[in-house]
């Protein structure tokens, strides 16, 4: 709940036994993931209309991993016509997360059951079929849709958003966990500093959000390029090998420094050329 000045004062909790409890505090951190409880209550969530994607995923045992030191690597595999893509994420105890991602309309509209849809997409991804040839599915299928969003406000007096409650871009580069940890770290620093200064205002608790948004925007741009089918990262890197280090930085989340977006000085025109909107020189 909030007081008359819109400052956070307390939360109403329900225990495992079903009992209701009122807990007061000075700062509320919304780390509720894509449930985004506070962001949804305050109507701060803004879905990205350009990334209306959906995913179907599950878990397998005994999937074929790459040998040696690459056995734990996350792998992205396209279907035949690049209408969708699969993730392959090795986890502990021989469990592998496997999911398919594509446009919401393509994946979930006018199709059969999610089991049949997943099987149909798998049937047009021979590389993933090979990895799952000896695997056993150990969980039911899960569905997520329209998961790309931002928030119009990330902090207020006595509250702050972090992780997926703050926003989510796309699963393609597996950046969500890193951004969740980074935003949590930055929010914690701002809270500690706020207590020391006696300032728990929205501007203090969210003082880091501007720089954070500037960095994550480079990943958002990279995702947009990935979903431009006419554009090829491979061809781009052959033409502009000087950006290899910059691209690597983006892919590993090293985005909070001056020059992190330099690659787009050449990539933006290359995409325009690929789309036929710009003449070749």
Residue ranges of model-derived segments:
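Predominantly flavin-linked oxidoreductase catalytic cores and closely associated redox partners
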Residues: 1-132
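Short alpha-helix boundary/capping motifs
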Residues: 12-13, 66-67, 116, 146, ...
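Tryptophan-centered motif/residue detector
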Residues: 27, 57, 85-87, 147, ...
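Short secondary-structure transition/capping segments
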Residues: 38-46, 98-108, 174-179, 238-257
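Short flexible/disordered coil segments
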Residues: 59, 63-68, 134-136, 144, ...
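FAD-dependent flavoprotein oxygenase/oxidase catalytic domain
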Residues: 102-104, 128-130, 136-137, 221, ...
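FAD/FMN-dependent oxidoreductases across multiple families
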Residues: 106-190, 196, 202-206
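C-terminal helical "tail/cap" subdomain of flavin- and related membrane-associated enzymes
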Residues: 189-281
